[in-house]
Each structure stands twice: as structure tokens, then as C-alpha cells.
């Protein structure tokens, strides 16, 4: 598909706009891959290669709901990418929200898994009224093409508690940092639509923009992301998977439909964006 080719080329092209500014494209994606549930319509063993292929051409990917053996599979299926992340339980097991990146483009400066809770540095801790631990994987990179620093966060918010999501918004807003020359990118399943108070607060507190709203081009006038495995449910799917950015322009965004044996390869659609970052 043409958008996959575009994603595969992202990061390799410098886009001249004005005589004094050079912009570099960076392909980013977020994908809730669905934890490995043997009762699912399409089992992980039958879809993990397609999951990896759906995002293989992008420079930065935030995954969600990745169990340890699923992380092993993604690393094996994406050998050209580097990765960082661990599970949400105290012992490192459970679902992870790892970050994958193109090491030929991005230098990894450091990363940390933080829990979405007031005691965010206590592994396995619960936040506010959440019934499960939730995490954010926070990574810093140097972009060799633009000379800019990137602050990247992959996260998966609570699906039950407004209070927990609002608390998570406050934490992540701070974790994006306040370096005016750095680019901040939040990738995640926030379990809330863009108009929800918690998402609006995250964008306001951290001066982030929703790529869906600000992209120069969007593949469809409107789309949802939490589709279930069944294509028939897409029309009513809420848009709860988001890419939020600060310090970059957005040329293009789309939620991609990948089908195997008549069903989607996850219960969420992967969302990608082509960002443009000015040269430092």
C-alpha cells in the first residue's frame, strides 16, 4: 500500500520549505497490539508477523498491551529496530508499553519505565482508583538528521477510572519536559477520545497538538481506532489511540486497516503520522 511505502521512506527525505529552513520527515506510530488471549478471533501466533509488518517502516513506534513473550516476538520480527520497555508488574512481567526506534536515525540517550501513580517510581504500584498498574515508557533520543532532541512517551491509560486518567495526564505532561528546542511525542492508547477532559488537560498542560486535528493531510475525513477484530465495527469505533506532538509539524496521519483471514490483526488499528522536524 502506498501509505506503507511512505512510512518506509519516512526519515530518509529532507523537505526544503524556505531558504533558511530545512525540514526532516520522521515517521511515528502507535499500536495497541492486544495482549495474547487464546480466545481471540485471531490468535497472536497467527498475527504477530502482520502486526510487526504494519509498522516496520516507521522511525518510532509506541506499542501497548505487550506481554513478555509478545515483546520477544516483536523484537525478532523487527530486527532492524532497537527497543526499550518492560512489563507493568513489579517483577517486570505483565503488559508493557515499549518504544521501538530506528537506530540508524536516532541515538538512544536513556529510558525509564514509570508507573502512572503518585508513587510513580515504585514498580507495580496502583494509581488513584485504577485496579491495574499502568505505565509510561519515557525515552530520550538525539535525531541525527535534524540535530534535535526527542522526548518520546509510550503509554496505556486506565480504561475504568476518569480520576486515574486525569492523574496520568498530569504526570505525562510533566514528563514531556520543557526544553523549547526539544520535540515531544506522546504515543498511546489513552482509553479516552480527544475531547475528553483528561486528554484536553494533557494537551493544554504540555502544549501538545493532536496530529489528527493539525495534520496537513489525513487519509479519511474521520476515523476511529478501537475497532475490535471485526471490520463491521469500524464505523462506530471510538478514536482513543493518539499521537500528540510538540515542536514538530504534521504532514500526514492515518489509522491503517490490516486484515488477515477476514478480520483485523488487532482489536485496535495502528495509527501513524509523518512529522516534519526543522533542522537545528
Task: Spell out what each predicted region is.
Residues 1-8:
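Sec-dependent signal peptide recognition
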Residues 9-77, 88-95, 277-280:
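N-terminal, active-site-proximal structural segment of metallo-dependent hydrolase catalytic domains
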Residues 20-24, 55, 76, 90-93, ...:
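Extracellular/periplasmic catalytic domains that process cell-envelope and extracellular macromolecules
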Residues 30-49, 115-131, 158, 232-234:
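Acidic/histidine-rich helix-loop elements
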Residues 33-36, 67-70, 88-92, 105-106, ...:
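Solvent-exposed loop/turn segments at secondary-structure junctions
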Residues 60-149:
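Structured beta-strand-rich core segments of catalytic domains in phosphoester-bond hydrolases
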Amino acid at each position: 500500500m502506498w501509505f506503507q511505502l511512505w512510512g518506509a521512506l519516512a526519515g530518509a527525505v529532507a523537505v526544503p520549505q524556505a531558504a533558511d529552513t530545512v525540514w526532516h520527515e520522521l515517521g511515528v506510530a502507535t499500536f495497541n497490539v492486544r495482549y495474547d488471549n487464546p480466545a481471540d478471533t485471531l490468535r497472536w501466533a497467527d498475527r504477530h508477523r502482520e502486526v510487526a509488518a504494519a509498522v516496520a517502516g516507521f522511525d518510532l513506534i509506541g506499542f501497548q498491551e505487550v506481554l513478555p513473550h509478545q515483546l520477544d516476538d516483536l523484537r525478532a520480527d523487527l530486527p532492524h529496530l532497537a527497543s526499550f520497555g518492560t512489563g507493568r508488574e513489579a517483577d517486570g512481567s505483565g503488559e508493557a508499553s515499549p518504544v521501538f526506534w530506528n537506530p540508524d536515525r536516532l541515538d538512544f540517550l536513556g529510558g525509564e519505565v514509570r508507573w502512572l501513580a503518585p508513587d510513580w517510581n515504585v514498580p507495580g504500584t496502583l494509581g488513584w482508583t485504577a485496579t491495574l498498574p499502568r505505565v509510561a515508557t519515557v525515552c530520550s533520543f538525539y535525531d541525527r538528521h535534524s540535530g534535535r532532541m526527542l522526548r518520546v512517551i509510550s503509554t496505556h491509560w486506565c480504561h475504568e477510572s476518569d480520576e486515574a486518567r486525569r492523574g496520568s495526564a498530569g504526570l505525562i505532561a510533566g514528563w514531556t519536559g520543557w526544553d523549547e528546542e526539544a520535540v515531544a511525542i506522546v504515543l498511546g492508547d489513552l482509553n479516552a477520545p480527544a475531547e475528553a477532559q483528561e486528554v484536553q488537560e494533557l494537551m493544554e498542560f504540555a502544549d501538545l497538538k493532536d496530529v489528527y486535528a493539525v495534520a496537513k493531510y489525513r487519509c479519511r475525513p474521520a476515523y476511529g481506532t478501537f475497532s475490535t477484530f471485526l471490520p463491521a465495527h469500524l464505523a462506530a469505533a471510538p478514536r482513543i489511540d493518539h499521537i500528540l506532538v510538540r515542536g514538530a509539524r504534521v504532514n500526514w496521519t492515518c489509522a491503517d486497516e490490516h486484515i488477515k483471514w477476514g478480520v483485523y490483526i488487532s482489536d485496535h488499528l495502528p495509527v501513524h503520522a509523518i512529522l516534519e522536524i526543522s533542522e537545528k
